A protein has these predicted regions:
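Signature of multi-pass transmembrane helix bundles
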Residues: 14-16
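ATP-dependent carboxylate/acyl-activation modules
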Residues: 1-10, 20-97, 105-133, 137-256
């Protein structure tokens, strides 16, 4: 599988297997520097996998989880991350080849623990000095309009010190958050990359508004004309647009 994928993909691959023998076979035939995704805080896992990473020069992702599962608090996750870091260094793996994943919990099920992930990430970056990785879109699972949550959480995580985001690079909203963040944090000098990407683009909201105006004009009406609205809510909408508070209140009561 590794050979087949590398024959058509030029980007680095992340190898994962719960069986150390299978993982080593993949590492042995890998061409270049692989990434092992992942180890966790369990001693037996660290003892089996880290020597393989050292032997084959692989970078490794460490999950801040152990036999007790994902801890809700930031301190507990940082403690696991510290354990992984110490084991990796003891195995001879350079610190720059270690990426810690503090694990994203879904806001729909564990809303009060969302900030713990960001806090743990920040501590791993500032106190442990390790690189960080995070599955961003997990945050919005089970909720509507997921892009709103994903882009906001991505921005929070980047500000906390996120190095690698597991995300959909085809999402225009997500990429816009990255480009804008790099401008505002001076990572994009002179806003060069931002300008190259967006100088000739029309925001989606502007394009939609223009399309609506064109549709209204095609019907021989002007924006705001009564022809735009119909049905039982039309009087209320017109009253709101004209700022007629009394009429709006009366129409609202009539609709209740």
């Amino acid at each position: 599988v590794v050979k087949a994928l590398q024959s058509v993909v030029s980007l680095p691959l992340q190898l994962d297997s719960s069986h150390a023998d299978a993982l080593e076979r993949g590492l042995r035939v890998y061409n270049g520097k692989p990434i092992v995704n992942s180890v966790n805080g369990e001693p037996e896992v660290l003892e089996k996998v880290l020597p393989l990473c050292k032997k084959y020069g692989a970078a490794v992702v460490g999950l801040a989880i152990d036999k007790k599962g994902i801890q809700p608090g930031a301190e507990d996750r940082v403690a696991i991350a510290r354990r992984i870091k110490e084991a990796a260094l003891a195995a001879g793996i350079p610190q720059e080849d270690l990426y810690i994943d503090c694990l994203t919990l879904t806001a729909s099920a564990q809303q009060k623990d969302v900030l713990a992930t960001v806090e743990a990430l920040h501590t791993c970056k500032t106190e442990l000095g390790v690189r960080t990785i995070l599955g961003v879109s997990n945050i919005s699972f089970g909720l509507p309009c997921r892009t709103y949550l994903n882009t906001t959480f991505l921005t929070m995580a980047m500000y906390a010190g996120l190095d690698l985001a597991i995300m959909n690079p085809s999402s225009e909203e997500m990429m816009a958050a990255v480009y804008a963040y790099n401008v505002l944090t001076n990572r994009d000098p002179q806003s060069t990359r931002y300008i190259e990407r967006y100088a000739n683009r029309v925001p989606a909201s502007t394009a939609l508004a223009q399309a609506n105006q064109n549709a209204v004009a095609a019907q021989g009406a002007q924006p705001g004309d009564a022809a735009e609205v119909s049905g039982p809510y039309a009087p209320l909408i017109k009253a709101v647009e004209k700022g007629l508070k009394g009429d709006a209140a009366a129409q609202t009561r009539a609709l209740l």
